[in-house]
Curated annotation (Swiss-Prot):
S-S bonds: none
Species assigned in the record: Dictyostelium discoideum
Stated name of the protein: Cyclic AMP-inducible protein BP74
Keyword presence, Membrane: no
Keyword set, alphabetical order: Coiled coil, Repeat, Signal
Induction conditions: By cAMP.
Domain of life: Eukaryota
Length: 814
């Protein structure tokens, strides 16, 4: 206690006089006791200068820190539950043990040690280490221990961040050290010609540059969506500033090169403005979005190019003085690019809706290309000299409609978009009809030369889809993208209008014109996500299932090729059934894709990665086939047949796709993208075959055999598929499948009955004894858990006060 009263008078005097110091800038310093780091703030100019003299070695006497404890954490000292009052902090020389202790100990017993408001802390066995610099946003200290760091390292945490300020001019190397906090710090190297990049309030990427003597600049990215790359060779370039909005972005620029390159990261964006000597300042108008507009210099003779941005995220990169107009896009939400050389074109404005999109147009070129990015969309209206203005009607969606000029003699083509995300690209005055689509939800293409056709309207439903129509060509092509769908209705001259009935689903029904008085083909979609493409007046029939895919129809189909996209399934059936025996495919509850090329010597079936499809064929002389379902979700399909009775399908609430072609010898295909579809066929000469389901997702298919007994199917709790073949002279053939993904390929019209499975494991049926082993294992784990809890409770009861036997300290109080 004698030492307590011998606390140096200088401490008391300095503390009591702290209120008279003049406040100016704020500074942050790190104080260490061994490996424990503590950060305190100074707001008095005299104290700040004193601390800096301690760091530089000019002050060697008053080097220890004392300050009043405030029992709550603060953002710049996030590692501890207390901090020092900035106004009370000062420096002293002598050593006293009463208020000296490690930070960790004080942090653990702060409530007992500081019961009053006048609790001081004077850790004399520590040392002042360095000064830290902060920005104006939420952040914390980022510091790492590096003694001889030639490489400047930046370590980021998990939050939005700000710019850290440079250390004083005395220290050319700026070291940054990080705590385990939510923060990122960006710092800059002094003696490099590299142009600075200022980051805003965003999630970023850490850039680490090699030492200044290394000509090659390396970029190290962190774990965020962004990369800031700085390019060298800025020797003669003008000052390049980066103005940031409230965005996420990376802008990389090479300025004094003939080729104007833009390097983007994988991020949202930033606003960049360049000064150009011979041009007016390029303005950037932002709406409610996060974006970036980059304007390139050398606009010497170009007209004023304004970019009006809507509610989107984009990056605009422009190369203006090149013959080839190049656009470099990254992996970002988009950019509106307008090209110069608008010498004779009218004013081209961009009207944006509530979308995210990129529209790039080259206007006075022979070829009218449209480049789209990976985005949702924007509304663009172009002025057309001769036709009337094309109006655009939007639904509840984000979309883009692009209309091309020079519609000299074509009729007005209206697009009514619904609740979709799409991009419509039209190239009208070209002999070759080109469509460029990106990685978007869809693309609606209407071709010109509708001189002899009625008005073609597009009615979209509550779907996402892509409908491409080529009307004045012999080949009826339908190109689909990887999307959900839309309802399309076409007017047919002679037949009545084909109605479309939708369920609760997102779908697309495409109807083609029937030129030759064919009967109307009706499609009743259920609760599915599907795309039905019908080419009616063509020899080739194309049937798709409930998939994400792309069907491309070829013109002079000697060889029947099928182009699949990135889909879950594609069912293709080819015509030319010279020997029209019934081709049946019975898939189970598998993930598959069935493609059929029928008029080839080799019958190939390619399957993909989908759930299943039940296919039942109609037999002329059979009665109606009922369908019994269990716990599944299904759909209703009804088709009218002239020469047959009505085929009813009783479905539940499932997701499926049913495609039917009625007036052909080929039997229909019923597929679903569903947990299951149970289809039962009746044979008038045999009793009805029943279907038994388990708790699984499956499909049981039973075939009637005249000379054999019924083939039984036993399922476990797995996903499986039972395939049964009719063999008159053979015994019953059973297939037991396990929890696999399989493919069943059947070629029926050959002498040899083959069943080929692709990439599956066969006969993985978990048997009864395996279930018993699992149940025994669960019982054993339950007993072990009960024993552990009992022992833990006994230990706690024997040691109730173990955590209270700690030492406390006495802190001096003023």
């Amino acid at each position: 206690m004698n030492k307590f009263y011998s606390l140096p008078l200088i401490i008391i005097l300095i503390i009591s006089c702290g209120a008279f110091f003049i406040h100016g800038e704020e500074a942050y310093f790190e104080y260490r006791i061994h490996n424990e780091k503590f950060i305190f703030k100074l707001s008095d100019d005299i104290k700040i200068q004193h601390a800096r003299r301690v760091l530089s070695g000019d002050e060697i006497s008053l080097t220890n820190v004392v300050g009043k404890i405030i029992n709550k954490p603060i953002e710049y000292n996030i590692n501890w539950d207390f901090h020092l009052d900035p106004d009370s902090v000062t420096f002293f020389e002598s050593e006293t043990e009463f208020c000296n202790q490690k930070f960790q100990y004080v942090n653990g017993y702060i409530d007992k040690l500081c019961e009053s408001d006048n609790c001081y802390f004077c850790p004399w066995d520590g040392s002042l280490v360095r000064e830290l610099y902060f920005g104006d946003i939420k952040q914390d200290l980022l510091l790492r221990n590096n003694e001889n760091q030639q490489v400047k390292q930046v370590y980021e945490g998990d939050i939005k961040q700000d710019l850290i300020r440079r250390k004083n001019k005395i220290h050319p190397e700026k070291q940054m050290h990080e705590e385990d906090i939510k923060q990122q710090v960006f710092f800059r190297i002094k003696n490099i010609h590299e142009k600075p990049v200022y980051e805003g309030d965003i999630k970023q990427d850490l850039l680490r540059r090699k030492n200044k003597n290394n000509p090659e600049k390396q970029v190290y990215e962190g774990d965020i969506k962004q990369d800031l790359l700085r390019r060298k060779y800025y020797d003669k370039s003008q000052s390049t500033q980066v103005y940031q909005g409230d965005v996420i972005q990376d802008i990389l620029r090479s300025i004094n090169r003939q080729e104007k390159e833009i390097y983007e990261g994988d991020i949202k964006q930033d606003l960049l403005r360049r000064n150009n000597q011979n041009n007016q300042e390029k303005q950037v108008y932002e709406s409610d979005i996060k974006q970036d507009i980059l304007r390139r210099k050398y606009y010497e003779k170009s007209q004023s190019t304004q970019v009006y941005q809507g509610d989107m995220t984009q990056d605009i990169l422009r190369s203006l003085n090149r013959q080839e107009k190049g656009v470099y896009e990254g992996d970002i939400k988009q950019d509106l690019l307008r090209r110069k050389y608008y010498d004779k074109s009218q004013s081209n404005q961009v009207y944006q809706g509530d979308v995210i999109q990129d529209i790039l147009r080259s206007i006075n070129r022979d070829k009218k290309p449209v480049y789209e990015g990976d985005i949702k969309q924007d509304l663009l209206l172009r002025n057309n000299q001769n036709p009337q203005e094309k109006s655009i009607y939007e639904g509840d969606i984000k979309q883009d409609i692009l209309r091309r000029k020079n519609l000299d003699k074509s009729q007005s083509i209206q697009f009514y978009p619904g609740d979709i995300i799409q991009d419509i690209l039209r190239v009208l005055n070209r002999e070759e009809k080109e469509v460029y689509d990106g990685d978007i939800k869809q693309d609606l293409l209407s071709r010109k030369n509708l001189a002899k056709y009625q008005s073609t309207e597009v009615y979209p439903g509550d779907v996402i889809q892509d409908v491409l129509r080529v009307l004045n060509h012999d080949e009826k092509e339908v190109y689909e993208v990887d999307i959900k769908q839309d309802l399309l209705r076409r007017n047919n001259k002679n037949p009545q209008e084909k109605p479309v009935y939708e369920g609760d689903i997102k779908q697309d029904i495409l109807r083609r014109n029937n030129l030759d008085k064919s009967q109307p083909k009706q499609v009743y979609p259920g609760d599915t996500i599907q795309d039905i493409l019908r080419i009616i007046n063509r020899d080739e029939k194309v049937y798709e299932g409930d998939i994400k895919q792309d069907l491309s129809g070829r013109k002079n189909h000697q060889e029947k090729t099928v182009y699949e996209g990135d889909i879950k399934q594609d069912l293709l059936r080819r015509k030319n059934l010279d020997k029209p025996d019934s081709k049946q495919v019975y898939p189970g509850d598998v993930i598959q894709d069935i493609l059929r090329v029928i008029n080839r010597d080799e019958k190939e079936v390619y399957e993909g990665d989908i759930k299943q499809d039940l296919l039942h064929r109609n037999n002329k002389n059979r009665q109606e086939k009922p369908v019994y379902e269990g716990d599944i979700k299904q759909d209703l399909l009804r088709r009218n047949n002239k020469n047959h009775q009505e085929e009813q399908v009783y479905q539940g609430d499932i997701i499926q796709d049913i495609l039917r072609v009625l007036n052909h010898e080929e039997k229909e295909v019923y597929e679903g993208d569903i947990k299951q579809n149970l289809l039962r066929r009746k044979n008038h000469d045999h009793p009805e075959k029943e279907i038994y389901e388990g708790d699984i997702k499956q499909d049981l298919l039973r075939r009637n055999n005249k000379n054999h007994q019924e083939k039984l199917v036993y399922e476990g709790d797995i996903k499986q598929d039972l395939l049964r073949r009719n063999n008159k002279n053979h015994k019953e053939e059973q297939v037991y499948q396990g929890d696999i993904i399989q493919d069943i390929l059947r070629v029926l019209n050959h002498g040899e009955k083959e069943v080929n499975e692709d990439e599956i494991e066969k006969d993985l049926m978990q048997r009864k004894n395996h279930h018993q082993e699992e149940e025994a294992s669960e019982d054993l784990e339950e007993e072990i858990g009960k024993l552990w809890n009992k022992q833990s409770q006994a230990f706690v009861e024997q040691h109730p006060n173990q955590h209270n036997n700690q030492k406390t300290i006495h802190l001096s109080r003023q």
